[in-house]
Amino acid sequence: MFNPYPQKKKRQTRNYTGPWRKTPGRLLGLLLIRFYQITLSGFIGNQCRHLPTCSEYTYEAIARHGLWAGAWMGFFRIIRCGPFGTHGFEPVPTSLGNSYCFYKPWCYWKISTKHNK
């Protein structure tokens, strides 16, 4: 049977496509990450030791948890991505515990290292 309204193909993207609140801070952070992915990432090359890559991880962390928490999670992920750091599959946690406060950003280091054990 002919369908006059064909379904649109789902667009492939490398970034998080789930639901998230579109606040000004998140939009600014995601815009900066996307700018990096489009411009600078091509010059640096695919050298990330993790899956998803550090920019994809930071994009998803900001989308899910906001600019402050997501940026700290991404920062610590980039620190761990060095030659003597971690590697492998490390997803963004779906929720943060109550012990993670905005005034203790060093606590976000512990979030990501739990996934590698």
From Swiss-Prot:
UniProt name for this protein: Putative membrane protein insertion efficiency factor
Primary location recorded for the protein, binned into one broad class: membrane
Record-annotated disulphide pairs: none
A Pfam family assignment: YidD
SMART domains: Haemolytic (SM01234)
Compartment list: Cell inner membrane
NCBIfam families in the record: membrane protein insertion efficiency factor YidD
